[in-house]
Amino acid sequence: MIGHDDAWRAWRSAMAGGRMHHGWILSGREGLGKASFARAAAAELVAEPGVPQPAFEMHPDLYVLRPLPANDDEVKKRDDGKPYVTKRNISVDQIREIGRRLNTRPTLGARRAVIVDCGDQLEKGAVNALLKMLEEPPQGTFFLLVVHVLGRLLPTVRSRCQILRFHPLSDADVMRVLDAEMPQLDNETRAAALAVAGGSPGAALTFAEQGLGKLQAIYSALLGDRDGDLALRGALAGAIGARPDRERQMAAIEAARMTVVRALGQADDHARLRLVEAHAGLVSLAAVAPTYNFDSGLLMTQIGSLLASAAPTREGAR
């Protein structure tokens, strides 16, 4: 919860105002802590003075919608407390089920809250079903939509919600999170995680947990070398491992994207165009990667080619 003082002030000011808006969009890049904020804010919203409050997961007036496990095997992993793969979207059936639960009044007080984590992952039918509830909210019900890319939401949904924006954290705040959550990190990994975080402590933690320091070093080398003999691209395939899961693949793409973003801040006009084109290619790759089962070697070769394309030509280097 580091670095969100402005968001808390806006939220608590709205609560104190007596006319709390029923729909809220928590907008900002992934990994800033929006979902954690939503849980804490929702619990604060529904709490009644003098009424004991159950733990969040057991609270009858707090609902969290997120993509379900991908299959029965992943359900078992979830139930066993293990990491599990989810479906790509929140389904319309999930939204409708919540709608049925909201037909009654809140249980412990006058308010209840529904957290959608995240609004970017709603099926088309689910968006329409949610929109109906936003247009005619059930009594005492408040919606908090965690959204990584605001432009993906329909304008009709955005127009019915207050937008609470979350901004990237400073390098110092990201480092505070890293030191608190992973104090065992060596200095090289800490520096690499900070370099690709882009103000997102979640991105820094994912990078460190996945052990992608070697990848980031190769990424940086590729931005300075056209890699004519493909040696660096070959090294990428070995660095990510033989069978990386989807989370590791996505973390690798995001680390490459943020390596380009960081280079953009130091580039001259001539280099900037190549970097922008490489960035666009990485964004497109991130969009299709969850849908297609990429061979890890092919994926890393494509990432490496995009980075190498942004490196200076021999003529440009002169």
Residue ranges and their predicted role:
Residues Q121-L122, E136, R152:
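Residues immediately C-terminal
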Residues N103, N128-F142:
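Conserved catalytic/switch belt of AAA+ P-loop NTPases
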Residues G109-A113, P138-L144:
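Loop/turn-to-beta-strand initiation segments
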Residues M1-G125:
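Clamp-loader machinery-focused feature within the broader ASCE/P-loop NTPase space
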